[in-house]
Amino acid sequence: EHYGLSTKGTGDFMRELSAKYGYSDITQFLVEYVSVHPEVDHQVDEEQRIFGKENDNFVLDAHLGFHFVPDSIRICLICDLEEAARRILDDIERTTEDATNISDSIAASQKRRDTMQKNFMCLYQVDINDHSNFDLVLDTTTLSSVEAFERVSAFIDSRNT
């Protein structure tokens, strides 16, 4: 909003696909379906590539955005697994995870992350945990959303001057 940029999130696209394929839980969809149907990853990846070619000045919320839209400011937000799980549970708009407690949410988050890392390494030989792929890596575990935005915004502004 601050920069007036459009936002495209591949997570949103993946959630739409999971519902289309009859899954109410994104982790179950990733583990059971996407792992054995790589064409789903390719669908999402192609959408990223096309979006990057057809648009300028946008935000792409994507694990592999740095790979498919290389001419970009590449920012990675990281967070402690327990805090990330708590945030997922607290997000009332998020309806594609079945976890109802912190332990289940942590387990689902870890399983989802491990599955994505394995799939991306297998498909593209890209390690999503390699921070050298990014211009900025920011640990948001103890930051409010306002504090995280301020730090990211300062970094973006410093790159655009």
Range-by-range predicted roles:
Residues 8-69, 82-83, 93-97, 114:
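ATP-dependent small-molecule kinase phosphotransfer cores
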Residues 45, 145-153:
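Short, amphipathic alpha-helical "lid/cap" segments that border enzyme active or binding sites
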Residues 55, 71-72, 134-135:
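Short, well-ordered alpha-helix to beta-strand connector turns
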Residues 71-111:
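Conserved phosphate-donor/acceptor-positioning beta-strand/loop module used by diverse small-molecule
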